Amino acid sequence: YLVNPAAYAALGAYMFLLILIGFPINFLTLYVTLEHKKLRTPLNYILLNLAVGNLFMVLGGFTTTMYTSMHGYFVLGRLGCNLEGFFATLGGEIALWSLVVLAIERWIVVCKPISKFRFTEDHAIMGLAFSWVMGLACAVPPLVGWSRYIPEGMKCSCGVDYYTRAEGFNNESFVIYMFIVHFLIPLSVIFFCYGRLLCAVKEAAAAQQESETTQRAEKEVSRMVVIMVIGFLVCWLPYASVAWWIFCNQGSDFGPIFMTLPSFFAKRPAIYNPMIYICMNKQFRHCMI
C-alpha cells in the first residue's frame, strides 16, 4: 500500500457510490428521452450524448477503479490500464465537447448571429459526431505510442503520463497538445458563447423583442446549460491545474494523495450533469413520472 489501507477502502466506497448513482441516473436519461418522442429535440440529442459519455466513465472507469482499490494497486496489467484510461478519457472528453456544442447551440438560438439559421436535427447529429471525433483524438493517441496511460495517484486508476519524460513516447508534445486543443480551446469557445449569450438575454429583456414566454423558456434552458458548465469547471479545473503543475515540475516530490484527490473529484460530473438536466427540465420530469 502506498498510503493507509483505510484510504483505499474510502476510495472503493466512493467509487461504489458514484456507480450506484451514476449508472441509473444516466441510463434513465437515455431511456426516457428515447421513449418519449416529444423529447427528441436537437438540444436533447446533445444532452443524450452527454449521458453516453458519462456511462463510458461509469462502466469503463469507475468499476475498474473500485475493483483495483480493493486490492490496493492496479492489478489488471497493461491492457487493463489502457482500457481504463481510454474509457475514462473518452467519456470526459465527450462530455466536454458536448458542452461546447451546447454552448454553440445556445449562442445560435439566443443570439442569432446568422439570420434565419435554425438549429436542426442534422446540426445536432453533426455536433455529436464532432464530439466523438474530438474525444477519440484525445483518448486514442496514448494507445498507439503518442504518450501512454499509466497508474496515477494511489495507483488504482490510469491516466495520461504527465509525470515522466519517458523516451520514445513524446509525452511533452502530447500533454501540450491536450491542454491547448482539448482544454483551453473548448473552454475559450464556451466562455465566448456564454458571454455573448448573457449580453443578448439582457438586450432582449430591455427591448422586449420577444414574447415573455419565449424569453422565459430560453432563459431556463440557458441557465441549465450554464450550471452544467460551471459544475464541469469546478470539478475539472483542479485536476487540470495539478496535472499541469506536475508536468512543469517533473522530479518534484509529491505524495500519491496529491494527484488522487483532484482526479476523483473530477469524476463527479457523471452524476450531477443528468441531475441538473432532470431538476431543471420540466418536460423531462413530466415524461419521467
UniProtKB/Swiss-Prot annotation:
Q: Which residues lie on this side of the membrane: Extracellular?
A: 1-7, 68-81, 145-173, 246-257
* 'Ionic lock' involved in activated form stabilization, short sequence motif: residues: 105-107
Q: Which cysteines in this chain are paired by disulphide bridges?
A: 81-158
Looking up SUPFAM superfamilies in the UniProt record yields: Family A G protein-coupled receptor-like
Which residues does the annotation list for site: Plays an important role in the conformation switch to the active conformation? 84
Report the principal subcellular site: membrane
Q: Which residues form a coiled coil?
A: none
Localization annotation: Membrane; Cell projection, Cilium, Photoreceptor outer segment
GO BP: absorption of visible light; G protein-coupled opsin signaling pathway; visual perception
* Its membrane topology: Multi-pass membrane protein
Cytoplasmic side, ranges: 33-44, 105-123, 196-223, 280-289
Post-translational modification comment from the UniProt entry: Phosphorylated on some or all of the serine and threonine residues present in the C-terminal region. Contains one covalently linked retinal chromophore.
Q: What does this protein do?
A: Photoreceptor required for image-forming vision at low light intensity. While most salt water fish species use retinal as chromophore, most freshwater fish use 3-dehydroretinal, or a mixture of retinal and 3-dehydroretinal. Light-induced isomerization of 11-cis to all-trans retinal triggers a conformational change that activates signaling via G-proteins. Subsequent receptor phosphorylation mediates displacement of the bound G-protein alpha subunit by arrestin and terminates signaling.
Family of the protein in this entry: Belongs to the G-protein coupled receptor 1 family. Opsin subfamily.
Its recorded name reads Rhodopsin
